[in-house]
Amino acid sequence: MAGVSAAWELSRAGWEDRFASITLYQRGWVLGGKGASTRADDGRILEHGLHVWLGYYDNAFRLVRECYAELDRTRSDPTCPIRTWQDAFTPAPDVGVFEHRGSATGTWVARFGTNELVPGEAAPDPDLGTLIRRGAALAADLVRSSRERPGVRVDAAVDLVTTVLRGMSADGLLRPGGGGFAAVDHLDFRTWLLHHGAAPETVDGGLVRGMYDLVFGYRRGDRTQPAFSAGLGVFLAVRMFLDYKGAIFWKMTAGMGDVVFAPLHQALDRRGVGLRYFHRVDALRTDDGGARLAAVELTRQVPGRVVDGYDPLVRVGDLPCFPSRPLADGLGEHCPTEAEPWPSSGGRVSLEIGRDVDEVVLAVGLGAVPLVAADIVAEQPRWRAMIEHVRTVPTRSAQLWLRDDEATLGWAHPGATVSGLDAPFDTCASMTHLLAAEGGEPDRAPRALAYLCSALPEGAPPVTETTEAFLNGWADALWPRGGPKSLEDERLHAHHTSTNTDPSDRYVQSLPGSSQHRLRADGSGVAHLVLAGDWIDCGLNAGCIEAATISGIQAAAVIEGRPLSDRVLGPLTWDAA
């Protein structure tokens, strides 16, 4: 998303007066990075993992809203089922945690109140008094929506919110000169909560554990080693619970590739941005002792003449989507195969600074940085420190299509997203609403859909084995009236698993003390090289699409000589001076 966001910002109206060309290079045939999704031959959505958008993702929502407004599908593509951003996203106010109380377990799902605010629209930054009033309103919402006595679990949520507000005030995190949230980045979130008076039951409970699950906050993916920056924890608690717009969560009504990246591909193409698929970045070459970028070395995976004419999208139910396999009729004999999934029949390409390009935005995933920028990492201590301290973790996910509906299965919370489960998957989301976008024969189609995800510990068995183990151990808890107990269970219509170990697919963590080692968009130390990605210091130092979007906005600002904060929505108080 970071590179797409930068291209979007740079290609605003009149860009031809500022630049000769803008070109985005993408490995393979699918745009979107960790947010990419495709469609199987039968129309099923295949994701990297579970994606929900939080209600404070103003910059990401603004980008999507601008994209849909520009495409104007109501006029230009009236048969498309998703024509506006409101068609693409639906509020998801039901959020829960799975609780472990001694030998007893149970699911607590609360309905967070919705509001009339619109994500992506500018709004005044809330002060502490406003946050306190919102916290009181949130507590009342939770009491009203809980199916239990208020004292059983709601008190933990109230304790969390009040502790965060009390601690923010005590530490002066919103006070000018207080250092912002970066002042407590060196602490673990749980440690900080205890220091400011949170009950141990709250800190060890499902709600806090769910926040760690949300950011895959476990060293090396090991759930016995929770680690999550207090700076980000406080920032996230405030923005997620007290500063959301419309709803706390928003879910997409089709795959993320369908509703975000396919429209962006279309809009960027319409703007005249060059979209060069099948290009893998191999290396950044420098000169002047590493102070200046000299060239970008790429491998062209198919011949250039094929790239020039390749259209990556197909229509599923009249919705433009990326296919799970490259389109053979567009590539001919150059189509990747199982024997050679990443061919290099197009040869190598060298983009020379001053001859082919003037400025470069590096927007690969952090895991790929040591590979493509090996010389820079070797030459610059700040890059080495970033690679050492800003860590990544692989993730795993499973999608389960079920033959019975959720009521028959006994799942009492349609549409809910629940965290705090135990290994091997810590989060389960009801995604049955996506079945309408997948189509299929009504008499044979699945009737429920669940997404599972978690960090992937070192040495973990294959995800198919862990999914099998999960169903065997957790089916009764999730679907007490009879869910599938194995991948071969006839109650399971289909399944799809994903192990995200590719360097660019690894999730960027926010471990205590790591933010100080992130580089800013303008901080590469290499002339002609600007940085973008959810791994840079962008003011929201978290692995999420909002951070990636902000980083792209900032990268564009650097290239155009504008302040980093220009066009960034939301409070930039991470390191307030």
Region spans (language model):
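N-terminal Rossmann-fold NAD(P) dinucleotide-binding loop
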Residues: 3
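Glycine-rich FAD pyrophosphate-binding loop
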Residues: 11-40
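C-terminal segments that line or cap access tunnels to active or ligand-binding sites in enzymes
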Residues: 176-178, 184, 235-266, 279, ...
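Short, glycine/acidic-rich hinge or "gate" loops at secondary-structure transitions
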Residues: 73-88, 277-278, 564-574
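A short, Lys/Arg-enriched amphipathic alpha-helix followed by its capping loop at the start of a domain
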Residues: 6-20, 267-273
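Short, solvent-exposed loop/turn and secondary-structure capping segments
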Residues: 33-37, 223, 227, 371-376, ...
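Active-site/ligand-binding neighborhood in enzyme catalytic cores
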Residues: 147-347, 352
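Dinucleotide-binding Rossmann-like beta1-alpha1 core, especially the glycine-rich loop
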Residues: 42-152
